[in-house]
Amino acid sequence: MGEYQLHQSRNLSVNQTLDEILGISRKSETTTTSSGSSGAEKNALNSPIRPPTRHGRESSGSNEENKDPIQLENGNGSTLSFLTSSSSATSSTAARRNSDDDFIKKLNDIRRRSLISTMDATSTPTTSVPIHFDSPRRESRPCLEIHVEESPEELSTHAVEITEFHRDLSENSLGTSTDHEDPSLTFRVDKELEQSESKKTTKRPASGVKKTLKASISIDAPKPKPRPRPQTSANLSTKTIKDKDQEMMQMSMFGSKLNKPSDAHHKEWLQKKEREIREKKAKEKAAAEQKAATEKERRENSAKLYQRWVQDHDKKAKELKSKKTQQERKKSENEKTTQDQKLKEAEKNYEMWKRERSKSVTDIRKKLEQEEDKKRKKEEEAKNEKIKEAQAAFLAWKRKKEELLNEEAEKLKKEQVQKQLEESEKMTRLSLANEAYETWIELKESEREFIADFVLIEAPPIPWLPPSNLIPRQFVRSSNGNRLRARSQSAKSIAKRSRSRPGTTTSLRPFR
């Protein structure tokens, strides 16, 4: 989240990014910069390139805007304001000095306001800010570190201003350098960087000395709080004093030579913290030992109580067992006595019943025999009645069946007689029809023979005349012509059969 917010704030100026990080509402004020500051310095401060932070420069593969300014200078040939050449270093030192002073003053004001606000917010001991960097409250606070590197020549000019500034800060931080101090907002001037710069300036000429301002802003955005793990006394004891010292050094105000009063306060504060940590550890150790002793005593007492309870429980169990055995014995004895009494009573009752039975055995046998005879008679009578009823039903069925069979036989006889009559009638009709047909044929033959003797000479047919001058393409014969031809052929055959004279142009008309 910190990298994402840093990418979002690249296009803003340094003042705007600081206001956003510290959570101060930006008012519509004009930045108090000196008139001698050049446009190149403003562009350098407002440039979107990320300045170096305590984590180092951003990787060159993430974005082209995040590249090192030296690489941009070598690749594109464009010079940046805070990395000028040796020729322009002497001319722009005064302007840069004023702008840097204004910038540091503004940061000091912001620092004082934030310290006052934290003092008001953390007045009660319950709302103390955790010192550890991985604490959940520190995640939501911004972490600001500013490294100011100056050459030895410029240290003499700024010595007075820096001492006054450190004095003010020490006076303000006396009341605020408590356990509730916000360790995330710190200013530090690296001694190693100053010594390296002094060594370099001895080798380089005065004209090539240049002052660089590196404002590194690292934002710790609010992250999701991790699930708290149960901390035991063993885990707390494993944390060494070196880790505590490193954390305290990171949370120190200034580590430079010029801030001797703050170093003394810081050392006192560190000693106080170490003493508190030792006392806390001793208290924790004593509490742990006391807790272990109490736990041991509690376990011993619980073991003794358990043994006593086991003994009491065994005694009670034995008593219960003895009581149960006695009760079972009594119960079994009572059951045996009751069973003996029941057997005796049953034997007495049996003897009484046997005597009564021996007296009335004969009577009972007679009665039983009579009853059996009656039952047999009744059964025989019922069987005879059933047989009679079955015979009567069978006879009635037989009669009906015979009647039906007789009726069917009579019907068959009648049908056969009727068929015979019909056949005889058909035969007589056929014989009569044959006789009539034969007589008719004889008559017809006699008529034909008689007619064949009288050959009639007919007039020749009139030639055909068309109804108009138009002649049809195809001549269609009429049905009368075919009929006349058939008649003529039949007449010829009759004539030949009767051995008559051959007809020349005559045609015989058949009789109908």
UniProtKB/Swiss-Prot annotation:
Coiled-coil annotated spans: 267-429
Biased composition (Polar residues): 230-239, 502-512
Disordered as annotated region, ranges: 24-103, 168-386, 481-512
MF (Gene Ontology): microtubule binding
Record localization: Cell projection, Cilium; Cytoplasm, Cytoskeleton, Cilium axoneme
A GO cellular component annotation in the UniProt record: astral microtubule
Keyword field: Cell projection, Cilium, Coiled coil, Cytoplasm, Cytoskeleton
Biased composition (Basic and acidic residues): 178-200, 260-302, 310-386
Low complexity biased stretches: 30-39, 78-95
GO annotation, biological process: mitotic cytokinesis; mitotic spindle assembly; regulation of mitotic cytokinesis
Tissues in which the protein is found: Expressed in amphid and phasmid ciliated neurons.
PANTHER family: MICROTUBULE-ASSOCIATED PROTEIN 9
Protein name: Protein maph-9
UniProt source species: Caenorhabditis elegans
